[in-house]
C-alpha cells in the first residue's frame, strides 16, 4: 500500500494550483489524474482543433518539474471510494493509498443529453475529446454544436479556424443567457452571424434531422461536479462538496476546491476561481492559515475579434435601475441596486468591462445617477 502526506484527487487547474501552493511546505505530494497525461491547460483544448497543437504544447509543466519538486503524478487512475476513518482512497485499479491530508479537486464532467438523429455525440472536456472531434469534423465536413455558452461559441470558432464550417443550435432566444441580458444576447447573435457563426435559436432538434445527420454533433450544455465517489461517505454535499473559506469539508483533513466544490451555495466553474481555491486548499493542507474570499465571476470571451466581459449575476439579477447603450460595435449594460453596480456586461471593450468590475468589487456608490454616461464618467 502506498502512502503520502498530501493526496490530490484531480490534475486540473484546482489540483495543480493546490500542488504548487504546497511546494516548499510539504515534501510528499501525490496527484491522481484520470487522464494518461501530465496536467495541461484545459482552456487551450480549442488550440488542438484550431491550430494542430499537441499535448506537449499545452502541458503546464514538463515531467522534470514534477521530479524536481517530488510531486508524484499517477496517471490513468481515479478514485472510486474514500474511507475517511482510515484515511484511505481506493483507485479504479483497486490500489489503495493512505494519506495524511486529502484534497478533492476532481473537477466536473460534461452534461449529456440525447440528440435526435445523431448517431454519435461528442463533448469537449479532455485532450482525447479534442482529437476525436477533430477527426470527426474532417470525416463529416461540418460541425453542429448544441449549446450557446462560452464553450460552445469558442469551440465553433476553433472548428471554423481549422477549416470546417460550424453552426450552433440553442433552445433559447439568444446565446450566453447566463452572462448577457436579452438585448446583449441579441446584439452578440447578430455579430456572430455576420462573422460566419450561424446560431439557430428556439431550436427544435427533432425538426433538424438533415443538419444533425450530416454533421459532427457536439454538445456544450454545461458540466456537473464529479463527486460520485464520495456517495458512501459523510462528506457533506449539495450540488458540490460543501466547503468553508479554508476549503475544508465537513470531514477533518479533507479539503475540496474548484469545480467540485460548493462555497456558500456558489459553484461557478470558472478557472480563476478554481486556481484560487486550489491555492488556499494546498496551503491549508500544509498547516498554513489561508482564507478564500468570494470572487465575483467575470467570464471573458474573445472570439473573431469580439470581446465580452460579464461581471456579477446577470441571469438572476433583479436590479432597481438598468442602464444600456447599443452602438455599432459596442454594447453595455449596468444593473444597479442601492446605487451600486451589482452586475454589468460589455461587448466590444474589455478595458471598460474591467473598470466596471473594479467598481463592483469595491462596492463603489453612484448617488444621484440618472444615465449610463454619468456612471462611466465616474468609474
Curated annotation (Swiss-Prot):
SUPFAM superfamilies: FAD/NAD(P)-binding domain (SSF51905). InterPro entries: FAD-bd_OxRdtase (IPR050260), FAD/NAD-bd_sf (IPR036188), FAD/NAD-binding_dom (IPR023753), FAD/NAD-linked_Rdtase_dimer_sf (IPR016156), Rubredoxin_C (IPR041575). Gene3D superfamilies: 3.30.390.30, FAD/NAD(P)-binding domain. GO terms for molecular function: electron transfer activity; flavin adenine dinucleotide binding; rubredoxin-NAD+ reductase activity. Induction: Up-regulated upon exposure to O(2). Repressed by PerR. GO terms for biological process: oxygen metabolic process; response to toxic substance. It catalyses: 2 reduced [rubredoxin] + NAD(+) + H(+) = 2 oxidized [rubredoxin] + NADH. Monomer. PANTHER family: NITRITE REDUCTASE [NAD(P)H] (PTHR43429:SF3), PYRIDINE NUCLEOTIDE-DISULFIDE OXIDOREDUCTASE DOMAIN-CONTAINING (PTHR43429). The disulfide bonds are not involved in the electron transfer from NADH to rubredoxin catalyzed by NROR. This is NADH-rubredoxin oxidoreductase. It comes from Clostridium acetobutylicum (strain ATCC 824 / DSM 792 / JCM 1419 / IAM 19013 / LMG 5710 / NBRC 13948 / NRRL B-527 / VKM B-1787 / 2291 / W). The gene is nroR.
Amino acid at each position: 500500500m502506498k502512502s503520502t502526506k498530501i493526496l490530490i484527487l484531480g490534475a486540473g487547474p484546482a489540483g495543480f494550483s493546490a500542488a504548487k501552493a504546497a511546494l516548499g511546505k510539504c515534501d510528499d505530494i501525490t496527484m491522481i489524474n484520470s487522464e494518461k497525461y501530465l496536467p495541461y491547460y484545459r482552456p487551450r483544448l480549442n488550440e488542438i482543433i484550431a491550430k494542430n497543437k499537441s499535448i506537449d504544447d499545452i502541458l503546464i509543466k514538463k515531467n522534470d518539474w514534477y521530479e524536481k519538486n517530488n510531486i508524484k503524478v499517477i496517471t490513468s487512475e481515479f478514485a472510486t471510494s474514500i474511507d475517511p476513518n482510515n484515511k484511505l482512497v481506493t483507485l479504479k485499479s483497486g490500489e489503495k493509498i493512505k494519506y495524511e491530508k486529502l484534497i478533492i479537486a476532481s473537477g466536473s464532467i460534461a452534461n449529456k443529453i440525447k440528440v435526435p438523429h445523431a448517431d454519435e455525440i461528442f463533448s469537449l472536456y479532455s485532450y482525447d475529446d479534442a482529437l476525436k472531434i477533430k477527426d470527426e469534423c474532417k470525416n463529416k465536413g461540418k460541425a453542429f454544436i448544441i449549446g450557446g455558452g462560452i464553450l460552445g461559441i469558442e469551440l465553433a470558432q476553433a472548428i471554423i479556424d481549422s477549416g470546417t464550417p460550424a453552426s450552433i443550435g440553442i433552445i433559447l432566444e439568444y446565446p450566453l443567457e447566463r452572462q448577457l441580458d436579452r438585448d446583449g444576447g441579441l446584439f452578440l447573435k447578430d455579430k456572430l452571424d455576420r462573422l460566419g457563426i450561424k446560431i439557430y435559436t428556439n431550436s427544435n432538434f427533432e425538426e433538424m434531422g438533415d443538419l444533425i445527420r450530416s454533421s459532427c454533433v457536439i454538445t456544450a450544455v454545461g458540466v456537473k461536479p464529479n463527486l460520485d465517489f464520495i456517495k458512501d461517505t459523510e462528506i457533506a454535499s449539495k450540488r458540490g462538496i460543501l466547503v468553508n473559506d479554508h476549503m475544508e469539508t465537513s470531514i477533518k483533513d479533507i479539503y475540496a476546491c474548484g469545480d467540485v466544490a460548493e462555497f456558500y451555495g456558489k459553484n461557478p466553474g470558472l478557472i480563476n476561481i478554481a486556481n484560487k481555491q486550489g491555492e488556499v486548499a494546498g496551503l491549508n493542507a500544509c498547516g498554513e492559515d489561508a482564507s478564500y474570499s468570494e470572487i465575483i465571476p467575470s467570464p471573458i470571451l474573445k472570439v473573431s475579434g469580439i470581446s465580452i466581459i460579464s461581471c456579477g449575476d446577470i441571469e438572476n439579477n433583479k436590479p432597481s435601475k438598468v442602464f444600456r447603450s447599443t452602438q455599432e460595435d459596442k454594447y453595455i449594460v449596468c444593473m444597479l441596486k442601492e446605487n451600486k453596480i451589482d452586475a454589468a456586461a460589455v461587448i466590444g471593450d474589455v478595458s471598460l468591462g474591467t473598470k466596471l468590475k473594479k467598481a463592483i468589487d469595491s462596492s463603489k456608490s453612484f448617488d444621484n445617477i440618472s444615465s449610463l454616461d454619468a456612471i462611466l464618467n465616474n468609474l
